[in-house]
Curated annotation (Swiss-Prot):
GO annotation, cellular component aspect: TRAPPIII protein complex
Domain of life where this protein originates: Eukaryota
Bias kind Low complexity: ranges: 255-273
Descriptive protein name: Trafficking protein particle complex subunit 8
Stated role: Plays a role in endoplasmic reticulum to Golgi apparatus trafficking at a very early stage. Involved in collagen secretion.
Region (Disordered): 245-287
TM helices/strands, residue ranges: none
PANTHER family tied to this protein: TRAFFICKING PROTEIN PARTICLE COMPLEX SUBUNIT 8, TRANSPORT PROTEIN TRAPP
Length: 1282
């Protein structure tokens, strides 16, 4: 309907009978009927070059009695809002909005657009006196030239404006003859037409005959455009009339009710309260015309359409075009050619005019219709309307200069706008570099600054036209910025349209984020203007641009507004509702507690509204509550219980370590040749979950998982249970009654703000079920009185693969099958383990720790055999306890698969393999003793060995098995230190030096008594059967006790055993009743201070001791332990055989920081302190003199640094290159030094950079020892970490 170049405006005045013909044929008015046929080709002569050109012109013909320009402040806003409400698609609504704005806006005083150029009079052959009707209509037209006249003008329209005086306005006369009319007569038709031609001239009179009497298929959809406009106009007028009635309705006290309209327009209504709600206010208008044109069929044929086109074509050729050519020629001669004195004078006003520029701008300037400026403007407008944009551009360009000189800025802005429109229409091929861009920059700003609010149609039209030109030139960003200027005017619906168009231009410019931002602004404005459908559409278009940007506030705003506006407009879809709920769930934890309560209620209400008939639980509440997938544990069967699972088990023992011990227990129960099947009872993120594990039928398959409330408000969950899929039964038919396992439910769970709770749910598979998989968590989220069924998928991710190049470049994970299970049809044995006695969590080195367990068969299967497997093969003993408290030791056997794993079979002298070890309901007691490690926790010389693993496995008669396991780990402290010294090689005399390492301040009493000394050999280190042939005899049998920080020495000698003698131990006391554990001696030397090539001594001397300790709080503790030292004579023999002194010094290197940050810009030198610990363990008991030396990279003088490779240059040096010190026997030297470093890198602060030269007493030969390598990372940073 609208176009860049306005259409010539033609007035239509008709008689009552002619309007009835239109109504009877299903049209609102005659202008409604002829609207589709107003475009025509014609020849127009250009006044400047006097050349004719063929132009296609579309006439805008309006019935003055029913159609016109709407009142700007009181009617037009409501019609524009109705145009926006017509469609739910924002682009289609804005297109209609622009059409309505262009057609209905009042004409501006600065232009001639919207002024009627000619008038068409229509009478019918049914009129009693058609010529008299013509006379009345001519008089009515003359009356309309009076601006105060309201004759024929509808109450919602402004007074019509005319381009020429009444006498000069061209008139055309049409006789309407409807053949359907019963009074129609061809004779009367011809007679009346002849009278008209005689009175008004043959060229000014025509006859329009309509012959159709039914609806034509050829004409279907021809009037859709004008019908849509009329529908919008009717609804807008009804709303405006309603508002006008409400505004003057008397209140309770007789005062009028000044209620503001729904749109933000704050103007005072000027529409008459007596105006009809719809249609025309002409006295001749049909009261039911609005109903007729909406409901009736349109009776018009193609012949009728051609007849109308012929009438209008003749009107153009003989009436309008000659008048326009004459008018353009007159205006061009009068004002268009005056380019000298007048323009020069006006251009000099800025130099010679009185007053300041500010005062001139403050006074609005208007021009008379016959002034030279308005004559130029009329000429330019006619040239543009009738297809001569080049000539129009020249006129507009000269005019805008004069108006700018006159400081008529509003008129100047309008002329500048049309200057751009004319130039673009004349030369559409111009690009951005060729077009006069400066013309586009200021019109909108000038109109906003200098035009009044009632001129908002001019501001909008200017902004739209300038933006269209910018867009055609490819300057989409500039087009968007130009439209954004409209935000400063009043009227939310007006600003919303401009913001939406600006968003489209930003999107075309590739500025997606700005486009979405402006769509959000537009949506807010549409919402304020009570247009929820378009508000929803703008929010919907903005939604994808903010996806996964983690902009919490914006995500929350978009989601809430979409749900609200979609509900108001009734246009919400389930897909968008799901996306909104997903975003609200994601952003809800970032909000304040009050907002979280409101948003949680919004989520539940949205789920209840948009998903009321769902068959499956919704899967949108993935984070409320949050399921901590890394905490998922699957427990296959009734044991172990949740409180028996060690959470830190993976930190102490690796998966391979557990498999080794499990395999040893399996072979001990089933034989060394039986294939290992595994017996994993608990699967978590640290276990091997690539295989599907077995779970017994008739027992619970339990799933433990942590649920976290991410909100700052409590949430209430009901009926929590697991979701199970992929169920298979023995018959292979899914869905049968037998294949559906029972699901355990947690009736109610409340999570306090930001609280994490561990829950345990289960699946109870029955016999006949072969396989199933847990795939989700089901629950009901309750808010107020509503609850919604929700489901959170449970899918565990395996460990990341990082072996091949492809796996390193892309994230590939192993399969995790911990939530899948196959069901074992045979029952598993089930034993309850109750820990009766267990030691303290911390212990002393070499202390004996006893664990007592009560075992009870609570299952439905007899336990045929049971065994204990441990990786501490040299530090564990096991046995059973009978009813009389008698302890029976079990025999230790090394595992078939690993010589460093020990197994103990729990047997009680049964003679038959069919005897059960533990019958159903039977109870027994067992124990196992563990000797603590010989080095304290955190010692620099402590071994890198695994913790003690205890695994008890048992099996039933049908071959199924189960296990119970523990990791013995705790803090260790040193209680006693032992060293051996050879006194006489011939008599094999030696001394044992004892020291109580507990400080006086650490305990009120610390007394250690030596009970026994024995010799032993470990067969695991040598492979030789334990048949040590010597025993140890103390020189004096005396009671040896040492208290805190005390020392003592025991002198003893090794004596060969006589033939048949087996006693290899000597007791120093006869009063003790202690039964020592029967564990083997240590298998190897544990200290890392030994050289890696040092020999391992299998022969040991064991010292059994008893300690009584009273700590500072008064707690009394008594326990035993056994410490082992190497046989000094075997050790000396081994060293002499190897002829090596490399084990005489024990060296360790430590640094205070493995990683240090230093600002090399502030200080070029970074200092890194290190500590060297050197222990003299020379077997020949000799003092030693050591020298610590720095090994320089550059050892010879060079002529320049450039001759040395960068990797060989000095980058680190030490504060003292040479350090010397003498170390006595068994003493330890502590040397502190500082490295100085110049570059950020990874440095070896020991290793090849330092060497130790040792000279032992009595020898002149120097022995070189190496310093262990210690890596330290020095990073460059803007700050220094001290």
């Amino acid at each position: 309907m609208s176009s860049v170049s306005p259409s010539p405006l033609i007035a239509l005045i008709s008689s009552e009978c002619s309007q009835k013909h239109a109504h009877n044929r299903g049209f609102k008015s005659l202008s409604h009927f002829i609207f589709p046929f107003t475009s025509h080709e014609c020849q127009v002569r250009e006044p400047i070059d006097n050349l004719k050109a063929s132009q296609r012109i579309r006439l805008d013909i309006r019935d003055i009695s029913s159609d016109g320009h709407l009142l700007t402040l009181s009617v037009l806003p409501y019609v524009l809002i109705q145009a926006l409400k017509t469609c739910t698609d924002v682009s289609q609504s804005i297109k209609l909005f622009r059409d309505v704005l262009a057609r209905c806006s009042e004409p501006s005083e600065h232009e001639s657009f919207g002024h009627y150029l000619a008038c068409i009079f229509v009478v019918s052959t049914e009129d009693e006196n058609p010529l008299g009707e013509f006379s009345k209509m001519i008089q009515t037209q003359q009356t309309l030239y009076n601006t105060t006249s309201t004759l024929m003008i509808p109450g919602h329209c402004s007074t019509p404006k005319w381009a020429a005086p009444h006498a000069k306005t061209p008139r055309h006369y049409i006789l309407l003859h409807d053949s359907r009319s019963p009074r129609s007569s061809t004779e009367r038709r011809d007679e009346l037409l002849a009278q008209m031609c005689a009175t008004y001239g043959n060229d000014n009179c025509q006859m329009l005959q309509l012959d159709s009497d039914s609806e034509s298929a050829e004409m279907k959809g021809v009037w859709d455009e004008i019908d849509e406009f009329n529908d919008v106009l009717e609804k807008g007028l009804e709303e405006a009339h309603q508002h006008s009635t409400d505004a003057i309705a008397p209140g309770p006290n007789g005062a009028s009710n000044q209620q503001s309209p729904s749109s933000p327009t704050s103007s005072v209504a000027t529409i008459s309260s007596t105006m009809p709600a719809v249609g025309s206010v002409s006295p001749n208008s049909h009261p039911n015309s609005t109903v007729v044109w909406k409901s009736s069929k349109k009776l018009a044929s193609l012949a009728d359409a051609k007849a109308v086109q012929a009438i209008l074509s003749k009107f153009l050729d003989v009436c309008l075009i000659p008048y326009v050519e004459k008018e353009m020629r007159f205006l061009y001669e009068t004002a268009g050619q005056k380019k000298g004195i007048g323009k020069s004078f006006t251009s000099m006003k800025r130099w010679f005019g009185s007053g300041t520029a500010l005062s001139n701008m403050a006074t609005p300037i208007t021009y008379a219709w016959d002034s030279s400026e308005m004559q130029t403007r009329r000429l330019a407008d006619l040239l543009l309307m009738f297809g001569f944009p080049n000539s129009a551009f020249e006129q507009y360009r000269g005019l805008k200069r004069d108006l700018e000189a006159d400081k008529a800025m509003a008129a100047h802005a309008v002329a500048l706008e049309m200057c751009c429109v004319a130039l673009h229409s004349a030369q559409p091929q111009l690009n951005a570099n060729q077009f006069m861009i400066k013309y586009l920059e200021t019109p909108v700003s000038l109109l906003i600054e200098h035009a009044k609010f009632r001129r908002y149609p001019s501001i909008l039209r200017c902004a739209f036209n300038i933006a269209d030109i910018y867009s055609d030139l490819g300057l989409h960003k500039e087009a968007a910025l130009n439209l954004a200027k409209v935000s400063s005017i009043e009227g939310d619906h007006l600003v919303a349209v401009a913001q939406t168009l600006a968003a489209e231009q930003f999107e075309k410019a590739g500025m997606g984020r700005k486009a979405s931002f402006h769509r959000v602004l537009a949506a807010n404005r549409f919402s304020n203007a009570a247009i929820p459908a378009l508000s929803f559409d703008c929010y919907r278009l903005a939604l994808p641009a903010f996806d996964k940007k983690h902009w919490g506030v914006l995500d929350e705003h978009l989601a809430v507004r979409l749900l609200e506006e979609g509900q108001k407009a009734g246009v919400m879809t389930t897909d968008i509702a799901s996306e909104c709920i997903r975003r609200l769930v994601a952003v809800c934890p970032k909000l304040s507690p009050s907002l979280q309560t409101e948003r949680l209620r919004t989520i539940v209400n949205a789920l209840d509204i948009y998903f009321p008939h769902r068959n499956e639980p919704v899967e949108m509440l993935t984070d409320i509550p949050k399921v901590e997938m890394e905490t998922v544990k699957a427990i296959y069967g009734e044991r172990p219980l949740w409180n028996e699972i060690d959470e830190n088990e993976h930190q102490s023992v690796s998966s391979d370590g557990w498999i080794t011990v499990e395999r040893a227990a399996h072979h001990a129960l089933f034989g060394a040749s039986a294939p290992y099947r595994g017996m994993q009872l608990v699967s978590d993120e640290h276990s091997d979950n690539q295989k599907i594990r077995e779970t017994p039928a008739g027992e619970r398959f339990r799933v433990m998982v942590d649920l976290t409330n991410p909100l700052k408000i409590p949430i209430h969950l009901q009926n929590l249970r697991l979701s199970v899929s992929d169920i298979h039964n023995q018959s292979g038919i899914e869905g049968s009654e037998k294949s559906i396992p029972e699901l355990g439910a947690l009736e109610h769970l409340q999570l306090d703000p930001e609280e994490t709770k561990t829950i345990e749910l289960y699946v109870f598979p029955r016999v006949g079920c072969l396989k199933f998989r847990v795939d989700g968590l089901l629950f009901q989220l309750a808010v107020d009185q509503k609850d919604v069924e929700a489901r959170v998928p449970l899918k565990c991710r395996g460990k990341r693969l990082n072996k091949t190049a492809k796996q390193q470049k892309s994230k590939i994970y192993t399969n995790d099958e911990r939530l899948s299970a196959t069901v074992a049809q045979k029952p598993w044995p089930l034993v309850e383990f109750r820990v009766i006695k267990s030691p303290h969590q911390w212990s002393y080195c070499d202390q004996a720790q006893r664990y007592q367990l009560e075992i009870e068969n609570i299952g439905h299967e007899n336990v045929m055999s049971m065994c204990l497997a441990t990786n501490a093969f040299d530090r564990v003993a096991a046995g059973s306890i009978d009813e009389n408290e008698h302890h029976q030791q079990f025999k230790m056997n090394l595992a078939a698969n690993n010589a460093k794993v020990a197994t103990f079979r729990f047997e009680e002298g049964s003679t038959s393999s069919t005897d059960s070890f533990l019958k159903i309901g039977e109870k027994k007691r067992i124990f196992f003793d563990v000797r603590s490690s010989d080095e304290p926790t955190g010692s620099t010389v402590a071994p890198k060995q695994s913790n003690t693993v205890i695994l008890i496995a048992y099996r039933s008669s049908n071959g199924t098995m189960r296990q119970w396991r523990r990791v013995i780990d705790g803090e260790r402290r040193r209680l006693i230190a032992l060293t051996a010294e050879i006194l006489d090689l011939d008599t094999k005399s030696f001394s044992i030096h004892l020291k109580n390492c507990v400080a006086v301040s650490q305990a009120a009493l610390s007394r250690v008594e030596i009970l026994r000394i024995r010799t032993d050999r470990n067969e695991a280190s040598t492979g030789i059967k334990n048949d040590c042939s010597t025993t140890v005899l103390p020189s004096v049998n005396r009671r040896v006790e040492i208290e805190s920080e005390q020392t003592d020495t025991i002198v003893a000698r090794l004596v060969p055993l006589s033939q048949g003698e087996t006693i290899k131990e000597s007791w120093l006391t006869t009063t003790t009743s202690v039964t020592p554990p029967k564990w083997p001696c240590p298998a190897e030397i544990h200290s890392t201070m030994d050289d890696e090539f040092a020999s391992k001594i299998a022969e040991k001397i064991g010292i059994l001791w008893k300690a009584n300790i009273v700590n500072n709080e008064g707690l009394v503790t008594s326990f035993i332990g056994e410490s082992f030292i190497d046989d000094p004579f075997v050790k000396l023999k081994t060293l002499k055989k190897d002829d090596s002194v490399l084990s005489s010094l024990r060296i360790s290197c430590e640094t205070t920081a493995k990683e240090i940050s230093h600002n090399f810009s502030a200080s070029h030198i970074c200092e890194l302190p290190i500590t060297l610990l050197i222990q003299n363990k020379d077997l020949q008991r000799r003092p030693v003199s050591v020298s610590i030396k720095l090994s320089s990279k550059v050892r010879e003088p060079v002529d320049g640094i450039h001759l040395v490779a960068p990797e060989n240059r000095h980058q680190m040096w030490i504060d003292r290159p040479v350090r010397k010190q003498t170390i006595g026997i068994d003493d330890e030297a502590k040397l502190e030094m500082k490295w100085k470093i110049t570059h950020a890198a990874v440095y070896d602060v020991g290793g090849a950079n330092l060497s130790i030269e040792a000279i032992f007493e009595g020898s002149n030969d120097a022995v070189i020892f190496k310093v262990p390598s210690v890596l330290s990372v020095v990073k460059s940073s803007s700050y220094t970490v001290v």
